[in-house]
Amino acid sequence: MKRTYQPSKLVRKRRHGFRARMATKNGRKIIAARRAHGRKRLSA
């Protein structure tokens, strides 16, 4: 059986990266929430 996590830097950036988050309203909400929480890393 193939494992579920098959790492790929490109897919990671495209799906969870900063620009992907900023592209949608809810994504911007996530970034804002992580900023308010004082996260060191905002996105992948």
UniProtKB/Swiss-Prot annotation:
GO MF terms, alphabetically ordered: structural constituent of ribosome
Gene3D superfamilies: 1.10.287.3980
GO terms of biological process kind: translation
Keyword annotations: Ribonucleoprotein, Ribosomal protein
UniProt cross-references to PROSITE patterns, sorted A to Z: RIBOSOMAL_L34 (PS00784)
Keyword field contains Membrane: no
Domain of life the protein comes from: Bacteria
InterPro entries, per the entry: Ribosomal_bL34, Ribosomal_bL34_CS
Pfam families membership: Ribosomal_L34 (PF00468)
One GO location term (cellular component): ribonucleoprotein complex
Family the UniProt entry places it in: Belongs to the bacterial ribosomal protein bL34 family.
NCBIfam families: rpmH_bact
Classification via PANTHER family: LARGE RIBOSOMAL SUBUNIT PROTEIN BL34M, MITOCHONDRIAL RIBOSOMAL PROTEIN 34 FAMILY MEMBER
Protein name according to UniProt: Large ribosomal subunit protein bL34
Species assigned in the record: Azorhizobium caulinodans (strain ATCC 43989 / DSM 5975 / JCM 20966 / LMG 6465 / NBRC 14845 / NCIMB 13405 / ORS 571)
